[in-house]
Amino acid sequence: MTAVDVHYVVEGSPDGPPVLLSGSLGSDLRMWAPQVAALTTAGYRVVRYDQRGHGRSPVPPGPYSLADLGADVLALLDRLQIRRAHFVGLSLGGMVGMWVGQYAPHRLHTLTLCCTSAELGPPSGWADRAATVRAEGTGAVAEAAVQRWFTPQWRAAHPERTRDFQDMIASTPAEGYAACCAAIETMDLTARLPKISAPTLVVAGADDPATPPAHAQRIADAVPLARLEIIGPAAHLANVEQPGIVNDLILGHLKENS
């Protein structure tokens, strides 16, 4: 478990309460663009970063574990001299958030878990996807990924943005994507969910084929201070498809627990 210095961007009030945004497999920090203005206008200090192996972050050889990705977060907080943060994670980012909540709870004010899962099998599916990406590049999985990320209606209404997200996935380093698949393949956070002490908001997309609402329900049922919100129409990147609703939910959660 050796941390790397991930690429990050800080926006908003330097003295505001820090909010860390952690993204999905195949994305970079641009996926959180719909949240930045709402959070900074409300006075928060917003930290976005690229997962290791993604965007402009280093790409160490894989496989990676969730503990590796969590160590990157703790190192980033240390680098920015942030003792505790509000953590918002989507998909892989939510898994990282649950790991931090279980193993470093003193670093969290609150936890927001969007479109994620505590256990996402079968492992063979992730191994197969990693093998495809290593052999053919991330472009080979980009089109299928955006079909999971957004509902057909949203893709039809936003063809240019859909292409931008497909290009984002295709530009992800193959080794980084495949190595993060390994982290998901070996992950099972279920048994330790009751150890998460942070007030937790769990958000599910009603139309999410990647992490359906039942996955969010299992998390919300097991985390002591959790509440569940299911929103729609929204697939896997609910923060992009329903930014107004997601922003209101996040801001409400942060204000209730400030």
What are the roles of these predicted feature ranges?
Residues I196, V202-A204, D208:
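Short beta-strand/loop motif that positions the catalytic acidic residue
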Residues Q217-L237:
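Catalytic histidine neighborhood in serine/cysteine hydrolases
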Residues M98-Y103, R107-G137, A142:
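Flexible "cap/lid" loop of the alpha/beta hydrolase fold
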Residues H7-V59:
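Conserved HGGG/HGGXW glycine-rich cap/lid loop of the alpha/beta-hydrolase fold
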Residues D68-A85:
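Conserved acidic catalytic loop of the alpha/beta-hydrolase fold
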Residues G89, G93, G97:
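Gly/Ala-rich beta-loop-alpha elbow adjacent to hydrolase catalytic centers
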